[in-house]
Amino acid sequence: MNRIIVCLICSLFNVSLFAQNYGIVLSGGGGKGAYEVGVWKALEEYGIAQKATVFSGTSVGGLNSAMFTCSQTDECIRLWREVVPVELTRDDEFISQTGLKKMLEMVDLSRLQKNIYPKVYVTAVRDSYTTLKIISSIFIDWADRTKRFLLNTEKDVGEIKNKLLATSAVPYLTNPVRLSDGYDYIDGGFENYGGDNIPLVPLLKNHPELDRIIIVYLDFESKVSVPEDLKADVIEIRPIIDLNGMLGSIDFSRPTINRIMDQGYEDAVEVLSSKKMYPVSSYWFED
């Protein structure tokens, strides 16, 4: 009976609890992506993660989008705390592609091919245009070189993995990734090359049904333009401290990952609390 009463009260006075369609935008930023894991943990505790129907991510945001969709939160935390510090620093590379491939093998990406799981978009840039982008940016609009891939429509799990590798292939630090369309692609977060590091666009274009969109930034100064006539409510979560810029992007040490992950959790809780939202357990009582 107590649970029924609580649900009735919430339906009258806290409609936000029952908003059914959430979209999640995850930014790029290499090692700073641990922040998004902390945010995701908070979203789960607040009952929001369970209502996410679509993700849009760039670079590490794309990797996390797939991971959050296909793995339990505890497993995501374990991968970041135990696997990332070892695998992504092997082979004397800034970001080991070999290690990243091994990490992706630990995630059941075939779940993206099932309709019961959220949609996941990732952003990448055609590599053949990067040099021309630098030379000709003042003359040509290169926005169409940014490619948005909906992973759920891909029939080949191997191609899903390749698209996740492509969205996180940092120029000059890792090799471009050849996809099934015959083009080479690089990290979608490099906006000087035509990328989009805060990929809100796929949600705006394809998902008008969303009740709320949560945008997670990895830089406390970042800001994306949100249309004034957007019907969905937008909640922005950003670090309240500097995550050390580019140096933070290539820092995969365990202490840094733990610190940044905790920061993401704390910042998310602060934002959600300010929106008069509460952990799911707060709405239930023992019989």
Regions flagged by a language model, labelled:
Residues I4-A19:
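Sec-dependent N-terminal signal peptides
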Residues F18-F55, A66-D287:
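Patatin-like phospholipase
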Residues G57, G61:
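Gly/Ala-rich beta-loop-alpha elbow adjacent to hydrolase catalytic centers
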